Amino acid sequence: MPRDGSFRGSALITHLHWDHVQGLPFFAPILAAGAELDVYGPAQETGTLAEAFHQFVCPPYFPVTIEELYGRISFHDIEDSDVELNGVKVRARTVPHVGSTNGYRVEMGGASVAYLSDHQMPQDGSHSVSDDVLELCDGADLVIHDAQFTKAEFAEKYYWGHCTVEYAVFVAQEAGAKRLALFHHDPAHDDEAMDQIVDAARQAAASTGLEEVVAAYEGLTLSFGG
């Protein structure tokens, strides 16, 4: 990405938990004068998306305020609506989690990707899915979905705002998606545990019509036919 001030881009924020927003003021392209970034995400019960970011990108939590960054950051509240960003169709819908949370569907060039990074499955362990979630994932070429817990882990942490690997497979199956990328891995899962989780997910998906199940990781590239 350019760091000479020519950067123009948009970012979709699902919610305001630290693991999803703390990188914003460290985003190198926006540290150059002339750069522009538009950030889209859900408004909060206590105020707008912009107000929420201004509360933590400032001293004493960060050395400077948003206004003191060299580039320009603009914030846009988006919830249960559809927008078009530079020719890319974006659909935002509310997803069950802890606090105001969006899921997104992105469509471009005949391909569709659904992104549900954090998704609270029914706390009783049942496999019902909200209409908004199914709408986002409907027939998607790729669903990137929360899959933090095994069944045993969920039994202890059912109220943490996440779901099991099996539930992620179920959502993709119910929506008629083609591919599933397991996401939001538990930090306690090492490589061996992740291999076992992916194997279990693939077995669960074997008779569902899903073409592929992978574990998302930094640098992963997936291609869509067309």
Where are each of the predicted segments found?
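Cap/insert and terminal regions of metallo-dependent hydrolase folds
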Residues: 122-212, 216-217
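Short, basic, glycine/proline-bearing loop/turn elements
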Residues: 113-120, 154
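Binuclear metal-dependent hydrolase catalytic cores
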Residues: 1-114, 124, 133-134, 194-226
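Active-site glycine-centered loops adjacent to acidic/histidine catalytic or metal-binding residues
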Residues: 15, 118, 184
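Fold-independent oxyanion-binding glycine-rich loops
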Residues: 78-79, 117-119, 146-147
